[in-house]
Amino acid sequence: DNLPLEEEFDWVDKVSINLTTQMLATLFDFPFEERSKLTYWSDIAASSPEMTGGDVNTEERVAGLTECLETFTRIWHERKGREGGFDLISLLQRDPHTADMVDRPMEFLGNLCLLIVGGNDTTRNSATGGVLALNQNPAEYDKLRADPGLIPNMVSEIIRWQTPLAHMRRTATRDLEFQGQQIK
């Protein structure tokens, strides 16, 4: 609703990040007014020097991840014993394999980071890459506008075209030919 009309804007900032943050807040039943913390925690969780190859402010990273753990530990205790609830924290509490996960803080934080980074990065990257691909291929965009029934296939194709996890690669374990293409 708040997108500018007839003027340029930053798609990643205005749509991709906002959309994924709203989705994550809904999945966690996280306070909506604090949802930007989810994006921040995702970004710092994925910013290890091992993953980025660059410099990382370790103190900021530790402080941010500590805040994430403390926030979700508080949420866990607030929801404990509550009936129903289909948010991810409530589901973890009800599953016998994860019901005591909060008592293992590093495991709890690790699982939170997997869920947050997985939900944030994959959706943000796919949505952004999809819009970029449609802008670079206007004939394909015209096909979608003419036939919205193509959209379900478009989603799968965007995920294939623009890998959701830019740092995840596939490595061939042996040379082979696949659909006429050499893979080494």
Where in this protein do the model-derived segments appear?
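Cytochrome P450
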Residues: 1-184
